[in-house]
Amino acid sequence: MLSEHHHQLLKATIPLLEAGGEALTRHFYGIMLSEYPEVRPLFNQAHQASGAQPRALANGILQYARHIDRLDALGPLVGQIVNKHVSLQVLPEQYPIVGSCLLRAIREVLGAEVATDAVIAAWAAAYQQLADLLIGAEEGVYADSAAAPGGWRGARPFQVARKVIESDEIVSLYLQPADGGAVMTFRPGQYIGLKLTVDGQEVRRNYSLSAPPNGSTYRISVKREPGGVVSNFLHDAVGTGATIDLFPPSGDFVLQPGNRPLVLISGGVGITPTLPMLHAAHEQSRPVTFLHFARSGRVHAFRDWVDDLVARHAQARRFYCYEEDGAAPADAYGRSSAELLDRWMPTPRDLDVYFVGPPAFMGAIKRMLGELGVPAGQMHWEFFGPAAALEG
């Protein structure tokens, strides 16, 4: 239980976290990943190397300290953490490892004069409070997934039923349960967790579900990333008939019910979670505008599928913008701009807008949407990787 004295000590560390939180989390990951190899599969080494994961954790710790008096304000952050943990199957027994490494990092980075026994005790109590909150929420999701029709808990073997080349960079895998059973439904926008063995090492990754739910199979669509351990493995080494362990669908970037016109904006492989959303809009006869930005027609996946669906939906429109002028025609050439959004989005701007793509792309889209009058509460976005503050 956190005491008032604990609260005061935690708040006193906020300036230190603001100034050096990323150094602390880098040290934390260095300790944990070197001394506890059993947790390495939960972490993407590319995100470690880029600093994205340490930055995300530093931001999470800082937000927790800032809101220690009113944890209800952390709702969106807690939801993101729970969904990521569930998709990778983080378990209660792994929390003490994280806690001990975090307290050690606080002591070693801040120094014994600042990180006194009292400060460490305050952070130990705060961490336990957060761990209990997350463990309880995650157990609820695990139990719900196991109880759902076609649901399961933990890893479930799936086989690659089909492998389809979608563009020069993207390949789709159609996955069906090895046991021949049904699969649980999911909400448009959610992702699935994969458990793989690559070069003798276990790795886990999330991929958006890119086809509407059908009760029997899932589809993921993977962009080949230069140097990407898992994406290149899925492109080059996984074929029809291969077995992949999957964790149940999760994620809080989902299409919300409503009657407002819908706008879906994607950049590159960010198109994947918007496809089930577009299909849902078609099923609901909901007005929808689909905007996709790509480098060229060669890397634009699912164009024919989108064109066909839009042609069958009386209240749907679609627009494409390519950076390069090539063989495939587009509605515009260049990069995303406020002028294009203004031209293509419906008016009035009382819209629900969902956008996904590289962080810089999403930051620009968010800024432009605000300039064009879209209410902040009606903008929704998803990070592929560690969640971060979206500048824009």
Q: What kind of feature is each model-predicted range?
A:
Residues 271-282:
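Histidine-anchored nucleotide/phosphate-binding helix
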Residues 261-272:
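Short, glycine-rich nucleotide/cofactor-binding loops
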Residues 148-243, 294-296, 307, 321-325:
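Ferredoxin-reductase
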Residues 247-260:
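A short, basic/flexible loop-to-alpha-helix module at the beginning of a structural domain
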Residues 1-154:
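Globin-like tetrapyrrole-binding proteins
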Residues 17, 288-392:
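Reductase modules of NAD(P)H-dependent flavoproteins
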Residues 189, 270, 358:
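Short, conserved phosphate/pyrophosphate- and ester-handling motifs at nucleotide-, phospho-/glycolipid
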